[in-house]
Amino acid sequence: LGGIASHSQEQLKKIPVPFVLSTVSLLGKEYKNDYSFVSVDDVKESCRMTEHLISQGHEKIALLCSYKEDVSIGALRLTGYKKALEAHNIPVDERWIRHMDPELDSYSMESGYRMTKALLEEGVDCTAIFAISDSLAIGAVRALIDAGKRVPMDISVAGFDGTEMAAYYNPSITTIRQPAETMAKETIKLLFDSIKKKTNVQQLIFEGELVPGESVKK
């Protein structure tokens, strides 16, 4: 869930049927006003989570991110993370930023586990980990527990997406919940309106919700 469409305008023009981009946006694209989309503002929501961690006393915050080449969800949430640190005059330490291994499944718990294990093995000093998806966060928690760390007493962990799995994990994951059901309904409505030619192009940006869990030390 989330991100920015990586398709070019030429590619989108070739689609022969009405369509609506769902959970991805065209924000920042020159042709953003030409197509309908439904999404959250990934930069804003990632910034919100990072600022939440800062408000809980954390300044050394590691980020479990997407592939280095990613120009979609990973790039947007990385931008939000950096924006929050800079707003609080916290220098960005590139050692804190970890990218997924392209040979592993994207956004998998194994990816989160491996990135966190590497952080620990390299002795990177951090008090919190912000994973840009709940699955990465769960993998991070497991790696910390396997290393003898206590979550959140030793290291706090936060995620993003607001999945049911994050709510029922132990400890429950502090996360940004996307209004997935509402977004799905609005996407379908826009699509049918487009098919029936009832509406012009629309862009709907929804607010995420910060859901406190047990994985962040208060």
Walk through the language-model features, giving the residues of each.
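Short beta->alpha connector loops
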Residues: 1-6, 135
